[in-house]
């Protein structure tokens, strides 16, 4: 039976039949899609995309991502060139890069040669080893870099080159002799070519075919025979632009300097072309230097120049507020931005996940009546997905056909990847189904993303089908494909499959990259296979690769989870010596470890100069090189993973001191915490022996984020009425994160509240999480599923669920025959642990004399008959047991806080916190 097409293919209905209606309950869209009716005058640009320098962009505090490297390896090198088949072959007059395009003869701005005794002095470049090596195939190195080069309007002017130029081009392409013979060939066409238009056409078309050697040879031939300075300037601009497209920035710089010294490179267009060339190679500092130099020589930047420098700064990784200064400057100088300008700014927002700033820019394009194209939409989608706003991204994707802009493979792949990173795999797969229905062919990136999803959710057969389909359409497995398989199987704990895939990868001569090794080490470490991780690290070192922050963070996380926190801290010093700066993920592991039951035991002794125990005598003979240091730690993990000890209460203050020291380091390095950091801090508070210690940690939380502190502190003080509105706003932010990150925050907050007696508050937070679907399918009338909850959240939820069951009984309804409470410690449990949650729930049920008992066939399941539970709920004493109360009064908490503050002040010297408070 033929499928019914999606409504929006033929009508304006935006709903897709494969997907649940948006917005999802509990995942509400925080703001509407961009509106074409928005009207903001240019005078108010500073309010919509504010005066860009002080723009109020969304903070990265709630990115919640532990590591983009491990989340989705399938998103690397996603190029939009695949949707632009004419990119590598443009007729003359259709500029391959407006930033480097040649000026009309009548508009060339020049400076007299007498004023230019010396060319600008540019800093030395970090350029490719070989100026004309075959490495430069014209492909962009990253999805981000390529994305913004296709938002330009195509030139529609009539073709200005002659048929003789086409003949000369074909002869040049077919030529295979030496330079002298090439020169003779071009001489034979000299009388037939019609000036610089023909020459510019030949230069660009040779460049489009990656014949840069011949392009340079022809340029040198043509520029010597051209006597007019402005025409020579056109040729120089075209040559620099062509070289820049292919990363040959050293040659482009030489061409520019020669032209400048000859008096025909002193044009806005030549400078703009060189700026663009630097930008395409990620050399934004050099691009800015050229930009400043042209102003020193009396040249006024035009739209092409500003677009080039903005694009260069974005590609170079400059912060948005810094890039926006050029936007402010161009407007002050009366240069009005166009679509290229906005697309470049959108790309900066995309890289940093600044989705609110991206939406402001997008709306401003509408206000200025600047038409958005598919690249504008794709970049907006990328920013929104990176910001975790998946419902909004879905709505914008649906809006595109209504705006007569059809989504392409990049549009779908961007949103699909966003859903996958958010753990919303069903929606990602539904979009893949829609792509197939609409006839949008999957490319390598799409296949790799789909493969990554199937392996992560354990659908091995579908993953194999995708591999077979890739082979059938001629797409070979590359390093991204293998990384997706390794990451997916690793997350599923299928380590035999991991080994098979890695063996096949080497057999097929696909070279592992840094991500491959990081994925393997992270997967093996999390699975406790430290010997395997150590062997992978040895291979990694022998391959001559250098560890990065992701690999170090994976090892540090493994050390922390095994109680070897001191060794983890010492490894931070090692990575710093290697010139690798720790990031928020690194410190989150440390904070979380101090807040859990793992102990520093022997690692603390090592950090004070003690010796490490090793699994073999060979390890102890290793020298203290960086590689051997890591191998030693793997040896320690192998030994310690089977020899954990319980936490000694006397270590509490020592660990508290270490957490405060970690905070100090984060402040010094200006590392902004995210929601994972906040969850780790709350976990640490839950394990403090006294309210005073917890208050000290919360005071540090205030330095990081006063809003989060206000909500947490208010709830802990029992001031729910005063802070609940702010709490709702905080929960909105948390709900933008992926499911596991959001549930971790709710678990940590409820644990802390429960630990310090705010049990009613813990219950309200747990119910809020349920209403927002933080824990999906957590309860029904017959079952309460607690396997994704912490101890505090689970106990609070048991009370709430039983009260709900009681209301059903008193409404006269019959309960199901069997009631179940699942704790995730049974045969099919998704939780790896020691059954602490099960024991906590068991103690709670016994304390209430609830008629639930452990199932004989499932040690993680408590069951009871509905009739027995109904009888128990009707007992007069039961209601009193079920209703939770807070056991810390505001007055008591305030007094304790005051004492804690005094205690903290007395200890400021030892914790070295005083400079941070100034």
Swiss-Prot record:
Keyword match Chloroplast: yes
Biased composition annotated in UniProt, kind: Polar residues: 1-15, 44-87, 115-136
Organism: Arabidopsis thaliana
PPR repeat start and end residues: 232-266, 267-301, 302-337, 338-372, 373-407, 408-442, 443-477, 478-512, 513-547, 548-582, 583-619
Record gene name: GUN1
PANTHER family listed in its UniProt record: OS03G0856100 PROTEIN, PPR CONTAINING PLANT PROTEIN
GO cellular component, one term: chloroplast
Phylogenetic lineage: Eukaryota, Viridiplantae, Streptophyta, Embryophyta, Tracheophyta
Keyword annotations of the record: Chloroplast, Plastid, Repeat, Transit peptide
Transit peptide feature, positions: 1-41
Subcellular location: Plastid, Chloroplast
Stated name of the protein: Pentatricopeptide repeat-containing protein GUN1, chloroplastic
Function text: Involved in nuclear gene expression via the retrograde plastid-to-nucleus signaling. Plastid signals that depend on GUN1 can affect photomorphogenesis developments, such as cotyledon opening and expansion, anthocyanin biosynthesis, and hypocotyl elongation.
One of the record's GO molecular function terms: DNA binding
């Amino acid at each position: 039976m033929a499928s019914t097409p999606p409504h929006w293919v033929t009508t304006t209905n935006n709903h897709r039949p494969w997907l649940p209606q948006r917005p999802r309950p509990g995942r509400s869209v925080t703001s509407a899609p961009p509106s074409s009716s928005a009207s903001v005058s240019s005078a108010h640009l500073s309010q919509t995309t504010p005066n860009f320098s002080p723009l109020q962009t969304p903070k990265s505090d709630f990115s919640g991502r532990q590591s983009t490297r491990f989340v989705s390896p399938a998103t690397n090198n996603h190029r939009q060139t695949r949707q632009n088949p004419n990119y590598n072959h443009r007729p003359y007059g259709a500029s391959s890069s407006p930033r480097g395009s040649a000026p009309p003869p009548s508009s060339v701005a020049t400076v007299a040669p007498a004023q230019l005794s010396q060319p600008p002095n540019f800093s030395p470049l970090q350029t490719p080893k070989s100026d004309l090596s075959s490495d430069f195939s014209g492909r962009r190195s990253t999805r981000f870099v390529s994305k913004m080069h296709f938002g330009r309007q195509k030139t529609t002017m009539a073709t200005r080159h002659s048929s003789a130029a086409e003949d000369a081009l074909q002869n040049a392409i077919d030529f295979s002799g030496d330079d002298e013979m090439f020169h003779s060939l071009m001489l034979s066409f000299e009388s037939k070519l019609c000036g610089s238009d023909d020459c510019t056409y030949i230069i660009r078309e040779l460049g489009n075919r990656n014949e840069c050697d011949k392009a340079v040879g022809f340029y040198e031939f043509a520029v010597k025979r051209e006597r007019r300075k402005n025409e020579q300037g056109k040729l120089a601009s075209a040559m620099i632009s062509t070289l820049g497209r292919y990363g040959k920035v050293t040659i482009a710089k030489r061409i520019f300097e020669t032209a400048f010294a000859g008096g025909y490179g002193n044009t806005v267009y030549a400078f703009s072309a060189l700026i663009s060339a630097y930008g395409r190679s990620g050399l934004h500092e050099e691009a800015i230097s050229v930009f400043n130099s042209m102003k020193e020589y009396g040249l006024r930047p035009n739209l092409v120049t500003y677009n080039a420098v903005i694009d260069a700064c974005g590609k170079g990784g400059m912060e948005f507020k810094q890039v926006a200064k050029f936007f402010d400057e161009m407007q002050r100088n009366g240069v009005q931005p166009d679509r290229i300008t906005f697309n470049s700014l959108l790309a900066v927002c995309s890289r940093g996940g600044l989705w609110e700033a991206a939406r402001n820019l997008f709306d401003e394009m509408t206000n200025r009546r600047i038409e958005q194209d598919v690249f504008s939409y794709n970049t907006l989608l990328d920013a929104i997905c990176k910001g975790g706003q998946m419902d909004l991204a879905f709505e914008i994707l649906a809006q595109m056909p209504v705006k007569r802009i059809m989504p392409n493979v990049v549009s779908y792949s961007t949103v699909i990847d966003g859903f996958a990173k958010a753990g919303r795999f069903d929606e990602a797969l539904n979009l893949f189904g829609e792509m197939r229905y609409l006839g949008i062919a999957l490319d390598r990136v799409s296949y790799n993303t789909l493969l990554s999803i199937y392996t992560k959710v354990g659908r091995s057969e579908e993953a194999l089908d995708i591999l077979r389909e890739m082979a059938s359409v001629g797409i070979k497995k590359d390093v991204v494909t293998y990384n997706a398989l390794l990451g997916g199987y690793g997350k599923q704990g299928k380590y035999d499959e991991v080994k098979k895939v890695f063996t096949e990868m080497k057999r097929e001569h696909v070279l592992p990259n840094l991500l491959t090794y990081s994925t393997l080490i992270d997967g093996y470490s999390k699975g406790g296979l430290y010997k395997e991780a150590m062997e992978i690290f040895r291979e990694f070192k022998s391959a001559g690769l250098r560890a990065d922050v992701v690999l170090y963070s994976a090892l540090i996380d493994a050390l922390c989870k095994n109680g070897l926190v001191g060794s983890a801290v010492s490894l931070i010093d090692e990575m710093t010596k290697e010139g690798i700066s720790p990031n928020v993920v690194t410190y989150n592991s440390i904070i979380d470890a101090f807040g859990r039951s793992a102990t520093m035991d022997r690692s603390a002794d090592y950090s004070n100069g003690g010796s490490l125990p090793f699994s073999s005598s060979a390890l102890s003979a290793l020298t203290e090189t960086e590689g051997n240091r890591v191998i030693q730690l793997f040896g320690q993990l192998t030994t310690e993973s089977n020899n954990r000890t319980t936490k000694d209460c006397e270590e509490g203050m020592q660990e508290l001191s270490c957490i405060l020291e970690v905070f100090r380091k984060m402040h010094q390095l200006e590392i902004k915490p995210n929601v994972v950091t906040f969850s780790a801090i709350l976990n640490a508070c839950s394990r403090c022996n006294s309210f005073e210690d917890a208050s000290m940690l919360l005071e540090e939380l205030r330095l990081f984020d006063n809003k989060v502190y206000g909500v947490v502190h208010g709830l802990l003080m029992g001031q729910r009425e005063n802070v609940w509105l702010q709490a709702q706003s905080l929960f909105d932010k948390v709900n933008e994160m992926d499911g596991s990150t959001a549930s971790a925050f709710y678990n940590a907050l409820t644990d802390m509240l429960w630990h310090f007696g705010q049990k009613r508050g813990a219950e309200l937070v747990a119910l809020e999480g349920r209403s927002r679907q933080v824990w999906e399918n957590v309860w029904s009338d017959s079952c309460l599923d607690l396997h994704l909850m912490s101890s505090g959240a689970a106990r609070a939820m048991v009370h709430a669920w039983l009260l709900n069951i009681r209301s059903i009984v008193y409404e006269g309804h019959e309960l199901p025959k069997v009631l179940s409470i699942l704790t995730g410690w049974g045969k099919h449990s998704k939780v790896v642990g020691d059954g602490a949650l099960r024991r906590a729930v068991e103690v709670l049920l016994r304390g209430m004399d609830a008629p639930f008992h452990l199932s004989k066939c499932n040690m993680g399941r408590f069951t009871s008959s509905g009739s027995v539970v109904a009888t128990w709920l009707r007992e007069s004493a039961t209601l009193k047991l079920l209703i939770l109360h807070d056991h810390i009064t505001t007055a008591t908490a305030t007094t304790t806080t005051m004492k804690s503050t005094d205690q903290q002040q007395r200890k400021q010297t030892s914790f070295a916190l005083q400079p941070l408070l100034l």
